Amino acid sequence: MYPSSNAMPRRSGWTLAGAAFALSLSASTAFAGCSGTGALAIGGPGGVTPFLPFASGGAISSLIAAINTSNTAFLTQSTAFVSAPANPAPGQEGGGVWARAIGGEITTKNTTTTSNVQALGVPVPGTITCDNENKLSFAGAQVGTDIASLNVSGWNFHVGSTVGYLAAKSRDVSSVGPLNPLGGTFTDELQVPFVGLYAAATKDGFFIDGQIRRDFYQNSLNDPLVSGLFNQKLDARGLAFSGNIGYNIPLQNNWFIEPSAGVVVSKVKVDPLNVSGSGLAAFLAGGFGTFPGQLRISDINSTLARLSVRGGTTIASGSMIWQPFVTLSVYHEFQGAITSSFDGVAVTNFTGVGGLPSGLVSTSNIGTYGQIGLGVSGQIAGTGLLGYLRGDYREGENLRGYSLNGGIRYQFTPDLVAPRPMYAKAPILKAPAAFVQAYNWTGFFIGGSLGVLNGQLDMDYLAPPIAAGLTANPRFAGALGGFQAGYDYQTGKWVFGVEANINATNARGAKPCQVFILVTCEDKKDWIGTATARAGYAFWNRSIVYGRAGAAFTNTTITATCNGNGVIPIGCPATDSQSRVGWTVGFGSEFALSPNWTVRGETNYYDLGKNQYNLQQIAPAPTFVVDVREKGFISTVGLNYRFTPGVVVAKY
């Protein structure tokens, strides 16, 4: 390992049900692989191209395709799955909980151009152009909760939080070409947990919404024969804003048409990727080994705009209300090519060996594509239960694919709902007063939560002397789910309580270790728990906002992994695991859906202080002593069952 010291979206969610018609769709044909010009046109032993780890473009284009698809999979479905009762009283409280799932496959095409190549410090004339094709399969789920103020001068206002998780696998399926005789060889398996806040407003047929979201990309890259990647970990982080606006126009005989527009603006930052090169593995396979180096991908920016028209009808059948629909959309990506660079500077700084290949890489973006969606939404009349199911097909010059997604929502409904879709706006006229009960929060509760865990380790090397003073800061993120139990006591508007919870998680993270260019510092945890007190205030009849503080505890494992699959360098792996205890503080809100059931969303910050880890390498390599500080966030959406709910007073 190391050298030794000796060396519906939107307001209601029915747009979540349709999407897109393909305008000017191109035929789907396989791309033709890689070719070069000038000195870079020469493959085999007489040329420099076989020694450039990213010249084929497959690794970069696959990574960009994976991040781009993950970045837009849920965002383009609109903001969140929100709705309101059809006939709310003026100023009525509202709230609900929802969940949706999505799965599908997308194939993207792009052109990668490698230029400005140098080898042994000498410019190499020419370029390498690769027509890359990547196939990405994905599946994910998202949950959210919101509270609302309904019929405020005819407006409905919703504010909520959401968490989710997307798993995907990207495969380079590019065709064989003169400079890539093996065709596509790169794969990327990734998980993308995310957290977000959303808001929506509706009035009559008008709706507008927005969401801000934080994404955490945990990649596992594999391309042993071309790039020298052996399931190597790579982290990236994204911030995205999405917005939608539209108008629902009622037609005769329960038909409707709904034009809308939306935009997703996002930025993803990718950590540097140090690669060991395919060297030994490629030579053993009879090929030509690539050199080690570092890949730096610039920020991946996206500005994806959408224009849609949705049409359908409403059908009442017994206790069900159905709304079949079709949606036609066109999407356009306004951002241009993504730029990257690779060189051997980091290797040279550590080993003193210079002249390693370097170059610039430009990868085209997805452009314009169309989408058609078919679906149906439904509501059980007289209840707060509603849902939808939809399928989408999309195609464009550089993209084609399909997805299937569906969702369900339950919301607080104080009176019987009129026989019309729950995708309702506030009425123009004053509604009759609804029978609303003020909630009593006193009593025991148990429940479950789903969410996201993310954070960072700050590593300070103490020994051996060769490493003292060096640092590394790997981040981590993953899905989280578990159980909580506690007790609340209400006095007046104030609510005080205690709670303990325990959650399983698949949180992982990685970043290049500073002690050696070809080593990655990885961290993981399998569970985390908290024990806290909380204090809240019931601003309204059925909802509270609260703060909480107490203890956090977990077990964190740190592993130093050799990028060269254990061949180079020696000493790998080095691992240590520590149980840790620290403090946590957070805030959240909770809403009473029924006399016994409540839903909540909350975020907690935790800090576990410093612990000392001893990363013992395989002898004769030395043990590395590292001070590690851990801090992070726990964001969840939870559902609680309360054993002793009560009605304080009935209000009319």
Label the model's feature ranges.
Residues 2-209, 216-218, 229-542, 554-555, ...:
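Secretion/assembly modules of Gram-negative surface proteins
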Residues 222:
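Substrate-binding cleft of carbohydrate-active enzyme catalytic domains
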Residues 563-567:
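Glycine-aromatic-enriched beta-strand/loop faces of beta-sandwich-type recognition domains
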